[in-house]
Amino acid sequence: MPRVRRPAAPTGAATLLALMWLASPALPVGGFSYSEGLEPAVEAGLVSDEATAQAWLLDQLLLGLGRGELAVVAQAVAAWRRGDATRVRELNDWLLSTRESAELRLQTEQMGRSLGAWLQQRPGTDAAALARLLALPPAPSYPVAFALAAAGTPASLREVALAYAFGWAENMVQAAIKAVPLGQSAGQRMLGALVEAIPATVDAALVLRDGERMAFTPMLAVLSARHETQYSRLFRS
């Protein structure tokens, strides 16, 4: 697999804008339609106000993204940059294996495909690497697709992981505002709490080895499975 080329010298503003673009909720990948278990947590009475929503999201950041997903993003960026197709596939397989319900699996596959379709329209996208992404069986996961999109920038692995985590946080706060429901000011306070926790979470994820990554969130798995047959719902997960 050819390496994904990136500029030799970073251009700060361009790199920052590229990461902001990738983390933007306006990116056409459908992230707004998923709550990742938050909606069934509201239905079960586990989340009912700002305090419980904030605690839920912080736990999800620390116990979910921080222990596995963010590490995959960083490791996949490195793999794309050195042209290691075997490593990319291993990371994609591992990520998909951590999705313990049908709707969580559907979410990462749908968003991965959608990001791949967006990359097809972007000038300068490495065509060979994109073909490898879209050919990943059974589908590219969103973290691995995000990693390819970021691999062609001069951004460091830490900067890429920070952008990914912030994009996730912003989307989840918006989901909480709709599902609980909460006001915009409450949402900004929750986002502030997540932003404070993200740097240390990313730093911990960056040093994880393969055998240290994990995805042990049984409550989330149970709630997500229940959500698949929930009577009334706003979100797809």
Swiss-Prot record:
Record carries keyword Disulfide bond: no
Primary location group: cytoplasm
Record keyword Protease present: no
GO cellular component: cytoplasm
Keywords, comma-separated and alphabetical: Chaperone, Cytoplasm, Nickel insertion
Cell compartments where the protein resides: Cytoplasm
Classification via InterPro entries: UreF, UreF_sf
Pfam assignment, any one: UreF
Gene Ontology terms, MF aspect: nickel cation binding
Function: Required for maturation of urease via the functional incorporation of the urease nickel metallocenter.
UniProt family annotation: Belongs to the UreF family.
Assembly and binders: UreD, UreF and UreG form a complex that acts as a GTP-hydrolysis-dependent molecular chaperone, activating the urease apoprotein by helping to assemble the nickel containing metallocenter of UreC. The UreE protein probably delivers the nickel.
Protein name: Urease accessory protein UreF
Source lineage: Bacteria, Pseudomonadati, Pseudomonadota, Betaproteobacteria, Burkholderiales
The gene coding this protein: ureF
